[in-house]
Amino acid sequence: YGSVGNEHMVSTFFAVLIYFLLLLSGRFIWAWLVKRRHTLFSGIHFAAGCIVWCAFLAFLFGQGFSDRYISDYLKKNIYVTQAGEVAGFADYCAKGAYTPVCLTYGPDGGTDMTTGTVDLSPYVAKEKKWHRIYRSFFTKHTRKDAPIAGKIWFPKEAENCPVVFMAHGNHSITAESYRGYDYLGEYLASHGYVFVSVDENILNERSGENDARAVLLLENIGEILEKNGDESQPVYSKIDEDNIALMGHSRGGEMIADAYLFNEYDAYPSNGMFTFDYHYRIRALIAVAPSVSQYLPAGHETELSDVDYLVLQGANDQDISVFLGNEQYENVSFSKDGSYIASSLYIAGANHGQFNTEWGEYDIGRPFSLWLNVKNFITAEDQQEILKIASLVFLDKSLKGKDTYADFLTDYAKYEEYLPETLYVQQYETSDALFITDYEEDSDLETAPCGSVSAEHFTMWTEEELADSESAMGKRENHAVRLKWKDTKAAYYEIALDEPMAMGEGGICFDAMDLREKAENEPMDFSVVLTDIHGNRAVSTLCDSTILYPAFPVKLSKLQYITGKNE
């Protein structure tokens, strides 16, 4: 809390200082133009006042400041052996061989397919009268007759295709948010997928509605699958109903996890008097810059099991400025009965809105957006390209069983030359993983589930709960060991196994973070030594295979460039 308070004090000081300078310079301009005090000193004051106001307006209405840390960090990659070309991947990522076809559906006419409505009143609170009037004016509907509507992309030449249902998040009710993923629908349709972008605008500009969003998504799935079985419909036989993926952005990214739960349940967790009967064959979830815990089923966090899960987050997200998707990622668990993966990708320079072409580069509305820094973003085209490639690889593995490039989800660096140039941080977990330790068992530093732990020559050795950032008020309910040292050669941390552990072909993986905050730091390096029961040793040095970046010094507002504070 102290860090947040100090940052608030610094920001307040600069805000007061700017206000004082503008007030003073405004008086100088007023004296010259209105009072007509045309003396030498008044002229100097007038010129100074004009400079101050021009600088302020340029600061306010400009895009802000550029960052150097991305290019500086990328230069550190010279320490890492660069991966060569991956055969066929460039062609794989290009537009596919199928011809995309686009249709619309909805209950109000003027669409290619006519659908119905759904009563969402059990899942969303009644609004005040003027809110209801406002909502019905723009949507022509109420919570009691929410439209089942959206847009469908599918491959013209193919049938029995896997299907992806996409849900947008909260935005202005006047924007057609569901149209913002046309680029993704066209791309995936060309690769043999049906892509349905669901219109949930009826629930925008309100709170406490994520459970209603989930029900609306599931009702859309039911309606589209019904059309899939109707010979008179243009989507007849296009969809493989055994291969369904859910995809969501922002609140939609959180909601797809709730929808997955509701699909498994027979009753609404918040009121069991309302029943469910969905049970669609949902195999995979893709969350894009998701929120978290806006809806808690029966007061619990949304925990998922035995489903493939992919989450992407931009480091420059000015709406969800903390990687909240990490919390849901860590609430995905696997049994040993199948083959599943959870993977996450953190993208430097990506914001919240550029994943949706209707939302754009400003993640907050006027007038607050005037303070946002947007000059340090990657382009919208690059941001969307990252989502397209990651989604295709993930869906091909999960829904089509294609593993050719599936290691993209565990080793993006192998494919880095095919991705837009920026920084990426990846983590993953597979269902066949065996954990040596995850630091969740107790507070004893010298124990691990599989054996014992020892450490020497560190200035700090502790286990602690992770936070998403220094200023984050919440915790991630995930623990790690924290080590700090000065003598690189002498310091060591050792885990000794009680019993031999059979190793698969995947090797040993470590999740690690560099907690240093200065971009000018040289890449962190340490060695991992593996000793077997016969005394044979294998040594791997970190910098020989990868680079562990320091924390990204992200600045979301223009004022942070003046105060020098990072997120």
Pin down the residues of each PLM region.
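Gly/Ser-rich "nucleophile elbow"/oxyanion-hole loop immediately N-terminal to the catalytic nucleophile
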Residues: 157-159, 208-250
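Short beta-strand element of the alpha/beta-hydrolase
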Residues: 160-169
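Extracellular ligand-binding interfaces
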Residues: 485-566
